[in-house]
Design a protein with these regions (language model features):
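Hydrophobic targeting/anchoring helices
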Residues: 1-103, 108-110
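Extracytoplasmic/secreted cell-surface and envelope-processing proteins
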Residues: 7-10, 96-98, 123-124, 139-148
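Short loop/helix-cap segments at secondary-structure boundaries that form the rim of catalytic
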Residues: 46-49, 122-127
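Generic recognition of flexible, low-complexity loop/linker segments
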Residues: 75, 118-121, 183-185
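Extracellular/periplasmic catalytic domains that process cell-envelope and extracellular macromolecules
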Residues: 79-82, 123-126, 188-190
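A short, well-structured beta->alpha microelement
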Residues: 109-124
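Short alpha-beta junction capping motif
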Residues: 128-195
Length: 195
């Protein structure tokens, strides 16, 4: 997906859509910015047109040249065989516009679910193939806005929320609870989950 791609975020949505139709995809890492190679099914081409995603039909010679270029360069091919079940780690009171990941997945039309500390504590990470985090603070220090917003109502509400969750999960402090969540995420990745 180089500069010739009209809408690279929507292209990820096309890849996801294609996987929902039990059609495999080759993700061409570092080739023209990470293009997707998909068999020329009419339903894929139609969906690309609907969503405004640029696609280029290729012939066998083009395919051989692409594979050769990938083989000779700092590139690779990842075979995508099934649609991933995606989770975003985010507090339940976050708004969709509070983070770029949620905005991007909504725009790309990629399905996801949200989870937070309760679900991670209960072992729900294993239900997902892919977990998205964004700049989370697992130190138990209530985030980066203490200095500028520690007296703001929203900040105090967030602090109470964190403390309540930690207590309800049986931890003596937010610090201990967040450390346990970080370990659960580490184990999730160690067991093959994508982060």
């Amino acid at each position: 997906m180089d500069q010739s791609q009209n809408d690279h975020l929507k292209a990820y949505g096309i890849a996801y859509f294609t996987l929902t139709k039990n059609t495999t995809i080759e993700w061409l890492l570092n080739y023209r910015g990470g293009s997707f190679l998909i068999d020329a099914h009419q339903f894929v081409q139609t969906e690309c047109r609907i969503r405004g995603v640029t696609f280029e039909p290729i012939n066998v010679n083009d395919l051989v040249n692409i594979y050769s270029e990938i083989d000779q360069g700092n590139m690779d091919i990842v075979l995508l065989e099934k649609k991933p079940k995606i989770a975003i780690y985010t507090p339940p009171n976050k708004q969709p516009w509070d983070d770029a990941v949620t905005l991007a997945l909504n725009y790309a039309e990629v399905d996801y679910e949200t989870l937070w500390d309760n679900e991670v504590h209960l072992g729900k990470l294993a239900d997902y193939d892919w977990l998205h985090l964004h700049h989370e603070d697992f130190t138990g220090q209530y985030g980066k806005f203490y200095r500028s917003h520690h007296n703001a109502q929203w900040y105090r509400d967030q602090q109470r929320q964190f403390e309540s969750v930690a207590t309800n999960l049986g931890y003596s402090s937010v610090h201990e609870q967040k450390k346990a969540i970080a370990r659960n995420i580490k184990n999730y990745v160690g067991n093959g989950g994508f982060l």
